[in-house]
Amino acid sequence: MDGLRQRVEHFLEQRNLVTEVLGALEAKTGVEKRYLAAGAVTLLSLYLLFGYGASLLCNLIGFVYPAYASIKAIESPSKDDDTVWLTYWVVYALFGLAEFFSDLLLSWFPFYYVGKCAFLLFCMAPRPWNGALMLYQRVVRPLFLRHHGAVDRIMNDLSGRALDAAAGITRNVLQVLARSRAGITPVAVAGPSTPLEADLKPSQTPQPKDK
């Protein structure tokens, strides 16, 4: 318990978006940041347990701040933060894929969204060894190194087949268009071709003879 408290206090001493917001609230209210953080975590947990739209709130927590931090990482000259957030998005995508198949069962558990939110916060925690880095090093990276050759071959084969199929469809469409265009014949339009012919035709009409 003391180790967890020390980690929380160390996190609150760092400079990031969360601590900046807590610092501004501390300056206005006079309440210490650790109490504000504890109150915010308690309110968030209660809302995830009993509030409406817990799934949407969880997804926003797992997406909004990481997206903001990723944009800052792209714009910064350092590449270390790029690696950190790329690792997070890999783990986030795999977690979303696993959740797609298990959400119908897990969403019935009362503490599911609280656990999901805690997991996402652990994965994005601004510390040298957060949940995303831990899962990547222990699970994702070994699987990738073991199977990336076969995956690359499958992807290359699928991309080649897709290009061949697209080329065949394009060729067939062009052939159909060419055949339909060749089958159209011009239709002659009836009517006088010149004004002179239009003037001569009434005079050629036979007149009745006088008896």
Swiss-Prot record:
Pfam families named among the record's database cross-references: TB2_DP1_HVA22 (PF03134)
GO biological process assignments: detection of light stimulus involved in visual perception; endoplasmic reticulum organization; regulation of intracellular transport
Topological relation to the membrane, as annotated: Multi-pass membrane protein
Key words of the record: Cytoplasmic vesicle, Disease variant, Endoplasmic reticulum, Membrane, Retinitis pigmentosa, Transmembrane, Transmembrane helix
UniProt note on tissues of expression: Expressed in circumvallate papillae and testis. Expressed in the retina. Isoform 1 is predominantly present in mature optic cups. Isoform 1 expression is confined to the cell body and inner segment of developing rod photoreceptor cells.
Polar residues composition bias: residue spans: 202-211
Region (Disordered): 190-211
Disease per record: Retinitis pigmentosa 77: A form of retinitis pigmentosa, a retinal dystrophy belonging to the group of pigmentary retinopathies. Retinitis pigmentosa is characterized by retinal pigment deposits visible on fundus examination and primary loss of rod photoreceptor cells followed by secondary loss of cone photoreceptors. Patients typically have night vision blindness and loss of midperipheral visual field. As their condition progresses, they lose their far peripheral visual field and eventually central vision as well. RP77 inheritance is autosomal recessive.
Protein name: Receptor expression-enhancing protein 6
Protein source organism: Homo sapiens (Human)
Gene name for this UniProt entry: REEP6
